[in-house]
Curated annotation (Swiss-Prot):
Its EC number is 2.4.1.152, 2.4.1.65. Keywords: Glycoprotein, Glycosyltransferase, Golgi apparatus, Lipid metabolism, Membrane, Signal-anchor, Transferase, Transmembrane, Transmembrane helix. It is found in: Golgi apparatus, Golgi stack membrane. The chain crosses the membrane at residues 16-34. Catalyzes preferentially the transfer of L-fucose, from a guanosine diphosphate-beta-L-fucose, to the N-acetyl-beta-D-glucosamine (GlcNAc) of an N-acetyllactosamine unit (type 2 chain) of an oligosaccharide, or a glycoprotein- and a glycolipid-linked N-acetyllactosamine unit via an alpha (1,3) linkage and participates in the surface expression of VIM-2, Lewis X/SSEA-1 and sialyl Lewis X antigens. Preferentially transfers fucose to the GlcNAc of an internal N-acetyllactosamine unit of a poly-N-acetyllactosamine chain acceptor substrate. It comes from Hylobates lar (Lar gibbon). GO terms for cellular component: Golgi cisterna membrane. Pfam families: Glyco_tran_10_N (PF17039), Glyco_transf_10 (PF00852). The keyword Glycosyltransferase applies. It comes from the Eukaryota. The keyword Membrane applies. This is 4-galactosyl-N-acetylglucosaminide 3-alpha-L-fucosyltransferase FUT5. It catalyses: a beta-D-galactosyl-(1->3)-N-acetyl-beta-D-glucosaminyl derivative + GDP-beta-L-fucose = a beta-D-galactosyl-(1->3)-[alpha-L-fucosyl-(1->4)]-N-acetyl-beta-D-glucosaminyl derivative + GDP + H(+); an N-acetyl-alpha-neuraminyl-(2->3)-beta-D-galactosyl-(1->4)-N-acetyl-beta-D-glucosaminyl derivative + GDP-beta-L-fucose = an alpha-Neu5Ac-(2->3)-beta-D-Gal-(1->4)-[alpha-L-Fuc-(1->3)]-beta-D-GlcNAc derivative + GDP + H(+); an alpha-Neu5Ac-(2->3)-beta-D-Gal-(1->4)-beta-D-GlcNAc-(1->3)-beta-D-Gal-(1->4)-[alpha-L-Fuc-(1->3)]-beta-D-GlcNAc derivative + GDP-beta-L-fucose = an alpha-Neu5Ac-(2->3)-beta-D-Gal-(1->4)-[alpha-L-Fuc-(1->3)]-beta-D-GlcNAc-(1->3)-beta-D-Gal-(1->4)-[alpha-L-Fuc-(1->3)]-beta-D-GlcNAc derivative + GDP + H(+); a beta-D-galactosyl-(1->4)-N-acetyl-beta-D-glucosaminyl derivative + GDP-beta-L-fucose = a beta-D-galactosyl-(1->4)-[alpha-L-fucosyl-(1->3)]-N-acetyl-beta-D-glucosaminyl derivative + GDP + H(+).
Amino acid sequence: MDLLGAAKPQWPWRRCLAGLLFQLLVAVCFFSYLRVSRDDATGSPRPRLMAVEPVTGAPNGSRCQDSMAAPARPTLLILLWTWPFNTPVALPRCSEMVPGAADCNITADSNVYPQADAVIVHHWDIMRTPSANLPPPTRPQGQRWIWFSMESPSNCRHLEALDGYFNLTMSYRSDSDIFTPYGWLEPWSGQPAHPPLNLSAKTELVAWAVSNWEPGSARVRYYQSLQAHLKVDVYGRSHKPLPQGTMMETLSRYKFYLAFENSLHPDYITEKLWRNALEAWAVPVVLAPSRSNYERFLPPDAFIHVDDFQSPKDLARYLQELDKDHARYLSYFRWRETLRPRSFSWALDFCKACWKLQQESRYQTVRSIAAWFN
């Protein structure tokens, strides 16, 4: 009883303290509400947990996450160890030639060798004595050497001398590190810009322009069998003259062109088809590689393959039939309604190398060019 009576005076004090704390809490909530309401009414932004401000100098108000992106890489320096076939070419900006590529500094000045990020070596120009004609064997750290050839294995000597020197391959072969075909087809960006084929201008039947005449080669043997059944006009050394600058004008008079390659290797489809035949609007007649190989790059009805016929005599008969049947002949040009042929240039090939080097920085070694290319 006495204990209970002694405790009673403490309870009123605790009630008073609790009441004061409650009133203080209500006041804080009330003023917070008034502040938020005022901000909403004036249009001022509510305070955020973290404000992300634009980075000074960043374009278009880029936020700070843009500053985390990798800094722009320095412009690559690419050395052409030689001009192809010792013939200088104009070098435009790669950003204008290859979509998505940045510009590279491309030069044939060998004095920049110690600073070059990559060196392009054109095989034809060093193949006679590779050991004497290659760049210095002590290369700067990280420098990549690119082996470059547009010739077939039949015309590339001393490949074995290059084992272990190169880091990338660059050629017409589709399995090259840098694929540089002689030509390709691309879609029209709009309506086809070329005029319809003028059949009345096609006054001749079959032509062939050949500079490297080898009597024992497969293409010469096939031609000799074919011309026994069909007239073929042959231009070049020891044949009909073809003055400089008149090739396209001359070949455009023909309905068909023998796009016979000088050697028979996979993917080796050269200017004989892309320029001599297609730019002259002549239907190409091809010998090798296989039809399936050609169809990797062309529609099946864009060319005539000799393998489709049992003999040269059968091919001759077919060409004579097409000569008289305009509708069937014109069917070999239907693909031009949606596609157009394009031809390579040295400058474009160098810019493809520029793009590849920008995209892939890993360092590798091609152990044997010969084992891969032959």
